[in-house]
């Protein structure tokens, strides 16, 4: 039996052990795990991202199980081979030199102007992501000043997928 490892959190799925919590009895082979299954520890990586770390015949190696889809199989798009960017073209991109620059021209207020209540920071206990109430999170749709308690209960960590309940108050030292 083989073992497969999540490249983000190093969770290992061992076919011989299975994962009863996920509904896979011991001996469940990798090909019977649903394609939409994702890592039970970090919820970031899908099945196709896992790497084979040990095969059943005692050979050890790290091999990605990810395979790129054939462009002709991508439905509803007009992708051609010419549309795919070659990795070498990335080397020609200019780099931004931000070393020593003040990226925040003005510091965000550290307390609410109306109530005077200080803004707090919350940290994900799974990955260390910090949600700062003063800054909000524009990418997630939270404007600066959005209190953590005002974030919907079904919100998840943008970095690892952990639930809102996995955040604790962050105290700066």
From Swiss-Prot:
Induction: Induced by AlkS and n-alkanes. One of its GO terms (molecular function) is electron transfer activity. Its main location: cytoplasm. Its cofactor is Fe(3+). It is found in: Cytoplasm. Fe cation 1 binds at residues 6, 9, 39, 42. InterPro entries: Rubredoxin-like_dom, Rubredoxin_dom, Rubredoxin_ET, Rubredoxin_Fe_BS. Pathway: Hydrocarbon metabolism; alkane degradation. Binds 2 Fe(3+) ions per subunit. CDD domains: rubredoxin. One of its GO terms (biological process) is alkane catabolic process. Coiled coil: none annotated. Residues 2-53, 119-170 form the Rubredoxin-like domain. Belongs to the rubredoxin family. Unlike other rubredoxins, this rubredoxin is unique in that it contains two binding sites for iron. It is most probably the product of a gene duplication event. The 2Fe form of the rubredoxin is a physiological form but it is less stable than the readily isolated 1Fe form. Both domains can form productive electron transfer complexes with rubredoxin reductase and accept electrons from the enzyme bound FAD. Involved in the hydrocarbon hydroxylating system, which transfers electrons from NADH to rubredoxin reductase and then through rubredoxin to alkane 1 monooxygenase. This is Rubredoxin-2.
């Amino acid at each position: 039996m083989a073992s497969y490892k999540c490249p983000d959190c190093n969770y290992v799925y061992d076919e011989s052990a299975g994962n009863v919590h996920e509904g896979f009895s011991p001996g469940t082979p990798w090909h019977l795990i649903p394609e939409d299954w994702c890592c039970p520890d970090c919820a970031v990586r899908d099945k196709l991202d896992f790497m084979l770390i040990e095969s059943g015949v005692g050979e050890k190696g790290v091999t990605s199980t990810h395979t790129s889809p054939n462009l002709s199989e991508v439905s509803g798009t007009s992708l051609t081979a010419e549309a795919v960017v070659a990795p070498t073209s990335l080397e020609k991109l200019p780099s931004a030199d931000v070393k020593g620059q003040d990226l925040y021209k003005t510091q965000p207020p550290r307390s609410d102007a109306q109530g005077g209540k200080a803004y707090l920071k919350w940290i994900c206990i799974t990955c260390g992501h910090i949600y700062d109430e003063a800054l909000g999170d524009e990418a997630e749709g939270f404007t600066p000043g959005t209190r953590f308690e005002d974030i919907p209960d079904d919100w998840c960590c943008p970095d690892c997928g952990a639930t809102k309940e996995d955040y604790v108050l962050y105290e700066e030292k």
